[in-house]
């Protein structure tokens, strides 16, 4: 019979079990089936056991030899090595797959546990296995939630990517090192980790690996190293860019400066303030009163940093004595001023940035309120520009601060300078540090001396008054004695304080004898005969008569403080005057003027309104003809005045555009008047750029451009350098206080006289006025030296005085 042979079966033995295999006996079995004998199988004599006898047919070669050759070839083959090498990677992939499968479930459970109505989604009873398997929607939501949390953290801190990259990098190094350690029995774990790090940082290292599996691990590490370093480089670049952006914005940077000046806000006053501070620094360096070559100035605003840097670069070219720093931040936060080192500043200037007067005062109050929590602010002067004097008491009430409110009096200045020729030049002179300016100085060695002795004693200055208890008095009595705490107010060039003690003090001591009293009496009597005494109550600022001139005024433009302009015009003009406002602003927005008229604050002027564009030729022509025909039938000769004002929003946002519109309107008005043959007494306009105004006046001498914004800015800057001067300028710019006037010389002398400036000062004092200079031949001279020499003046010349609107004649013989 044909026999069927069952070949040898042998279990698979791993290489690690090879030694054990060699030590054990072989369990090879062979079974051959032959034809059975007729007698069948013989049973053994022992119960329960039997023997099977096998017989091989065919090949008689021993079976163990073939099996050994097969095993040796199998262990050395390439498939075997690949299978063995992939087993660890397969294990890692399975673990990662397990984690990936379990992660959505964990996220889902955590989210459901945090939701107050999570139980509502589990209303239908499900199989526990189905409950454990998350839906695809939950998986997507969980992944989106994880990505959202990561991006949120990334927005807060860009360094999150850097941390994640480092963790992933070291994880790959550890895993790769463990793989190397698995297949390198003769290498320590430390060397394997270092080898993995070398493959990560140097892509050429994986080429040095000997086995394919090690090369595969090195290749993976090299690829990840390239990805890691590219991402790391981009992250570091972005982090550096973000840091530089914060540095450029300056919002979170701490200023480490001292004795610097902080300016909050940007408007049309800023360039003039910088000009004044630059001039003051030049004189301080020249006099040796400062050790710093440049004055550090910090410009703070809520505008973007790029715009501020452009302004700073433009200003740096013109003001070489200033070192301008910029900081973009909120002006209503205490943290902003703390980072600006406000407690170490020399002064703080807060400028308005809004057109509405209420917004100006509100922003100013909030900025000052933000300074209140900062310590050591009692000695730091804070100069705040406000729209009205009503804010004085409110700002002064904030404890712990030295607040100096400065009222924005550009409207009053514009009217004053338009009514009095050369007054704008006098203001500029008194605010120019290279010329004569207001000074306040203590003289302890002169304590007890009478004010008359002080007036006549100083020959190099013009004594203007006394500052006592924070209040300035321009008209003390001659018998008033100087107290130790008083400060003398005078006009002189800017000098060191100690130099004033070296001035000549002639006539300081006057003997109070009968002869001297008689001499003084005779001098007063002689002077009173040569002057025109003031009335007991003046009704006009521009004239000593009982009523001002009657005029017709055409006001072109509109802004919120027009009411102040009308009030100032009302104090210069006489009864029966008229004022018409032409603007494209609706009548509903002009109710403030009507309310002032209704309350009786405007007495001499009748106000009317017209709606139209004052830059339109036909509209402006119609308004001028209407003003001309209004008094044509009357017998009186009514003078016509045309004034142009700038829009407040344009002054704050684009001053150059405001100047262009004002200049064009004034030139258009002059052209129309010339064509119609209308005689205009005064053509005046506001302007910010004084260079443009001078350029136009060279071509058109009949036009007047008044830089009231510049004067107000110079006042603010001067108060920042000496806060005590705020009371001086407050009184001068106040409509109800003392003001600077340019008065005809015929009020103080007779024709043919040649009095000295000292004599003119004494005659002005009899009129309760303070003479500070004169205008001779169109040239102004303030604080003339010497004062005792005769001055040849014509009757067309003028005397510059500081006077009150209502000054009673108190001089008695």
Swiss-Prot record:
The chain crosses the membrane at residues 161-181, 216-236. SUPFAM superfamilies: TrkA C-terminal domain-like, Voltage-gated potassium channels. InterPro entries: CASTOR/POLLUX/SYM8-like (IPR044849), CASTOR/POLLUX/SYM8_dom (IPR010420), RCK_C_sf (IPR036721), RCK_N (IPR003148). Residues 258-407, 550-712 form the RCK N-terminal domain. It is found in: Membrane. It is a multi-pass membrane protein. Keywords: Membrane, Transmembrane, Transmembrane helix. One of its GO terms (cellular component) is plastid membrane. It comes from the Eukaryota. One of its GO terms (biological process) is potassium ion transport. PANTHER family: ION CHANNEL POLLUX-LIKE 1-RELATED, ION CHANNEL POLLUX-RELATED. Belongs to the castor/pollux (TC 1.A.1.23) family. This is Putative ion channel POLLUX-like 1. It comes from Arabidopsis thaliana (Mouse-ear cress).
């Amino acid at each position: 019979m044909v026999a069927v042979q069952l070949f040898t079966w042998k279990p698979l033995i791993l290489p690690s079990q090879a030694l054990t295999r060699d030590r054990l006996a072989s369990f090879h079995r062979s079974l051959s089936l032959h034809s059975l004998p007729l007698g069948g199988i013989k049973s053994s004599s022992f119960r329960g056991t039997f023997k099977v006898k096998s017989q091989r047919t065919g090949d008689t070669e021993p079976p163990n030899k073939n099996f050994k050759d097969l095993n040796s070839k199998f262990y050395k083959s390439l498939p075997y090595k690949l299978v063995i090498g992939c087993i660890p990677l397969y294990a890692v992939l399975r673990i990662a797959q397990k984690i990936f499968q379990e992660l959505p479930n964990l996220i889902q459970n955590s989210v459901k546990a945090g939701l107050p109505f999570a139980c509502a989604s589990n209303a239908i009873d499900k199989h526990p296995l189905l409950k454990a398997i998350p839906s695809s929607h939950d998986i997507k939501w969980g992944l989106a939630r994880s990505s959202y949390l990561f991006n949120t953290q990334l927005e807060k801190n860009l360094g999150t990517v850097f941390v994640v990259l480092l963790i992933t990098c070291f994880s790959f190094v550890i895993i790769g090192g463990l793989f190397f350690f698995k297949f390198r029995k003769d290498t320590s774990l430390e060397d394997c980790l270092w080898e993995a790090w070398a493959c990560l940082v140097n892509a050429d290292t994986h080429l040095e690996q000997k086995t394919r599996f090690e090369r595969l691990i090195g290749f993976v590490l090299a690829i990840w190293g390239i990805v890691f370093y590219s991402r790391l480089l981009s992250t570091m670049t972005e982090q550096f860019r973000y840091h530089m952006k914060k540095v450029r914005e300056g919002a979170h940077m701490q200023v480490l400066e001292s004795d610097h000046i902080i300016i909050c806000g940007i408007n049309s006053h800023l360039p003039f303030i910088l000009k004044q501070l630059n001039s003051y620094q030049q004189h301080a360096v020249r006099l040796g009163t400062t050790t710093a070559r440049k004055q550090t100035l910090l410009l703070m605003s809520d505008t973007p940093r790029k715009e501020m840097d452009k302004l700073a670069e433009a200003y740096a070219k013109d003001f070489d004595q200033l070192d301008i720093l910029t900081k973009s931040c909120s002006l209503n936060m205490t943290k902003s001023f703390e980072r600006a080192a406000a407690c170490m500043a020399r002064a703080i200037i807060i400028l308005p940035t809004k057109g509405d007067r209420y917004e100006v005062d509100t922003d100013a109050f909030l900025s000052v309120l933000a300074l209140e929590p900062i310590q050591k602010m009692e000695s730091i002067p804070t100069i705040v520009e406000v729209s009205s004097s009503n804010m004085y008491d409110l700002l002064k009430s904030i404890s712990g601060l030295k607040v100096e409110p400065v009222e924005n009096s550009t409207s009053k200045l514009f009217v004053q300078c338009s009514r009095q020729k050369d007054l704008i030049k006098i203001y500029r002179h008194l605010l120019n540090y290279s010329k004569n300016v207001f000074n306040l100085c203590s003289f302890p060695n002169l304590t007890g001396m009478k004010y008359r002795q002080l007036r006549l004693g100083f020959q190099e200055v013009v004594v203007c008054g006394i500052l006592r208890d924070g209040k300035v008095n321009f008209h003390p009595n001659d018998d008033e004695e100087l107290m130790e705490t008083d400060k003398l107010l005078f006009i002189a060039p800017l000098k060191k304080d100690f130099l004033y003690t070296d001035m000549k003090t002639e006539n300081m001591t006057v003997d109070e004898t009968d002869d001297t009293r008689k001499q003084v009496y005779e001098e007063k009597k002689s002077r009173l005969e040569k002057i025109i005494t003031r009335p007991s109550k003046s009704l006009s600022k521009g004239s000593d008569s009982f009523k001002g001139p009657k005029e017709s005024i055409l006001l072109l433009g509109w802004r919120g403080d027009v009411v102040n302009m009308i009030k100032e015009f009302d104090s210069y003009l006489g009864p029966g005057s008229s004022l018409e406002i032409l603007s494209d602003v609706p009548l509903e927005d002009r109710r403030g003027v009507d309310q002032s008229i209704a309350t009786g604050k405007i007495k001499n002027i009748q106000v009317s309104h017209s709606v139209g564009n004052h830059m339109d030729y036909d509209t402006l022509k119609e308004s001028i003809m209407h003003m001309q025909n209004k008094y044509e039938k009357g017998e009186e000769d009514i003078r016509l005045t045309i004034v142009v004002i700038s829009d407040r929003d344009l002054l704050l946002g684009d001053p150059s555009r405001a100047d262009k519109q004002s200049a064009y309107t004034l030139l258009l008005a002059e052209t129309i008047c010339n064509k119609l043959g209308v005689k205009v007494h005064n053509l005046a306009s506001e302007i910010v750029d004084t260079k443009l105004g001078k350029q136009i006046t060279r071509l058109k001498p009949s036009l007047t451009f008044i830089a009231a914004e510049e004067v107000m800015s110079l006042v603010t800057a001067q108060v920042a350098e000496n806060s005590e001067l705020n009371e001086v300028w407050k009184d001068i710019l106040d409509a109800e206080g003392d003001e600077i006037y340019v008065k005809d010389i015929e009020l103080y002398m007779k024709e043919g006289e040649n009095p000295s400036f000292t004599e003119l000062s004494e005659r002005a004092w009899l009129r309760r006025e303070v003479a500070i200079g004169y205008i001779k031949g169109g040239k102004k001279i303030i604080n003339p030296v010497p004062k005792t020499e005769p001055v040849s003046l014509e009757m067309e010349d003028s005397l510059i005085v500081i006077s009150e609107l209502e000054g009673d004649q108190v001089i008695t013989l």
